């Protein structure tokens, strides 16, 4: 729980914006768990009479629904002091497809490759590609949040920005789902 009281969005601390994005990341991780389990044990998905791409796309339906509620409510709370809470609610709902795509993309990311060289770290040995593996998925969600950042800078949500957010989120969600392949 993070509370910040300001006179308007122009005075919104950057920490609040970062905390909102981290909260959205956490919510996307939670709803992406079924995709991760399906990636680890793909037998059930393969038994369905659907193409693998269709199954992966279907795995984004529940995350979109859940994240539309979570992101919409949190954006509504951020915009309470702005005088246009419905516009902020619409913006939060419009960013949900990007985070749902991020959840599915993260769920189907490849496992770490321990057969290659490792890097020594204070936490022990790590494979060289650990960074690229860990950001696969959340990268789409953070990119999808760019119009929200623009709204924070503007201090308001014009309705054209909601349309841009929805189009941008849909494009990123399609990219995320299409690049999330079933493991062989």
What is the predicted function of each stretch?
Residues 1-46, 50-184:
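Hydrophobic alpha-helical transmembrane segments of membrane proteins
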């Amino acid at each position: 729980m993070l509370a910040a009281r300001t006179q308007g969005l122009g005075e919104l601390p950057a920490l609040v914006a970062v905390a909102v994005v981290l909260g959205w990341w956490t919510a996307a991780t939670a709803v992406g768990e079924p995709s991760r389990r399906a990636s680890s044990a793909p037998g059930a998905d393969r038994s369905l009479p659907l193409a693998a791409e269709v199954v992966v796309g279907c795995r984004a339906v529940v995350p979109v629904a859940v994240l539309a509620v979570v992101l919409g409510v949190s954006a509504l709370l951020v915009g309470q002091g702005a005088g246009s809470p419905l516009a902020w609610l619409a913006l939060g709902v419009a960013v949900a497809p990007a985070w749902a795509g991020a959840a599915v993309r993260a769920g189907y990311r490849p496992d770490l490759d321990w057969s290659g060289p490792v890097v020594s770290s204070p936490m022990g040995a790590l494979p060289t590609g650990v960074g690229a593996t860990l950001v696969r998925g959340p990268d789409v969600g953070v990119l999808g949040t760019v119009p929200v950042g623009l709204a924070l800078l503007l201090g308001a949500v014009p309705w054209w920005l909601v349309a841009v957010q929805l189009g941008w989120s849909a494009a990123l969600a399609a990219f995320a789902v299409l690049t999330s392949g079933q493991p062989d």
